[in-house]
């Protein structure tokens, strides 16, 4: 019941969801079902970047991001998507208590606008991070790169309330589904 209260509070605080929701996955060819080793893919990206340069050395390469919804902490996202021009990669991490213990989920997607933020609503901490390099939106516990532990990045603790609200709602609903399956 506490999670339902958090969902209602998130709706009141953030207004109606809309902008920044996860994008529909593009064609199956964008999916990545291979092992965690991306060496071959990295070589393809370098070749693609070289062929997509505009006169003057400017690049028109589309950003590639992981795209998954509400995965538990121990699962990796293997789906990828080419973002539209001007989009960024986003990672949302939610830590909250459920009847069965601590639940951590992560969601990743392309979005038109992203500003890093960390908020706590009804005991659930939500952290959104943004990045602009290919396949950069992995949770910090799955990344070999050192990341800002606060999740604030250069943008500071501000963010689009619609984006955070929609993402928080998505993660809380996933948690409710996990709790509902275990009730007597």
Curated annotation (Swiss-Prot):
Biological process (GO) annotations? cholesterol homeostasis; intracellular protein transport; positive regulation of chylomicron remnant clearance; positive regulation of chylomicron remodeling; positive regulation of fatty acid biosynthetic process; protein import; protein localization to cell surface; protein stabilization
Describe what happens upon changing residue 56 to R: No discernible effect on interaction with LPL, chylomicrons or APOA5
Spell out the Acidic residues composition-biased ranges.
24-50
Disordered: region residues: 21-35
The signal peptide annotation in the UniProt record is 1-20
Q: Where in the cell is it found?
A: Apical cell membrane; Basolateral cell membrane; Cell membrane
Instruction: Give start and end of each UPAR/Ly6 domain.
Output: 63-148
- According to the record, which residues are glycosylated? 78
Regarding the membrane, this protein is recorded as:
Lipid-anchor; GPI-anchor
Report the outcome of residue 38 to F. Answer: Loss of sulfotyrosine formation
What the entry lists under PANTHER family is as follows: GLYCOSYLPHOSPHATIDYLINOSITOL-ANCHORED HIGH DENSITY LIPOPROTEIN-BINDING PROTEIN 1 (PTHR16983:SF12), UPAR/LY6 DOMAIN-CONTAINING PROTEIN (PTHR16983)
> What is said about its interaction partners and assembly?
Mostly monomer, but also homodimer and homooligomer. Interacts with lipoprotein lipase (LPL) with 1:1 stoichiometry. Interacts with high affinity with high-density lipoprotein (HDL). Interacts with chylomicrons. Interacts with APOA5.
Domain comment (free text): The N-terminal acidic region is intrinsically disordered. This region contributes to LPL binding, stabilizes LPL and protects LPL against loss of activity.
Q: What is this protein called?
A: Glycosylphosphatidylinositol-anchored high density lipoprotein-binding protein 1
């Amino acid at each position: 019941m506490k999670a339902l209260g958090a969902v209602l509070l998130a709706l009141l605080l953030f207004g109606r969801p809309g902008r920044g929701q996860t994008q529909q996955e593009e064609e199956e060819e964008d999916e990545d079902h291979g092992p965690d080793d991306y060496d071959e893919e990295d070589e393809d990206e370098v070749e693609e970047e070289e062929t997509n340069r505009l006169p003057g050395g400017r690049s028109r390469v589309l950003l590639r991001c992981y795209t998954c919804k509400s995965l538990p902490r121990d699962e990796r996202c293997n789906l990828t998507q080419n973002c539209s021009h001007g989009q960024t990669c986003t990672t949302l991490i939610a830590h909250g208590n459920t009847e069965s213990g601590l639940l951590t989920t992560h969601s990743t997607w392309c979005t038109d606008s992203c500003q890093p933020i960390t908020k706590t609503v009804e005991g659930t901490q939500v952290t959104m991070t943004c990045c602009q390099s290919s396949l950069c939106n992995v949770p910090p516990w799955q990344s070999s790169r050192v990341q800002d532990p606060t999740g604030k990045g250069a943008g500071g603790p501000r963010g689009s309330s619609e984006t955070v609200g929609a993402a928080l709602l998505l993660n809380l609903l996933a948690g409710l589904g996990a709790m509902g399956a275990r009730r007597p």
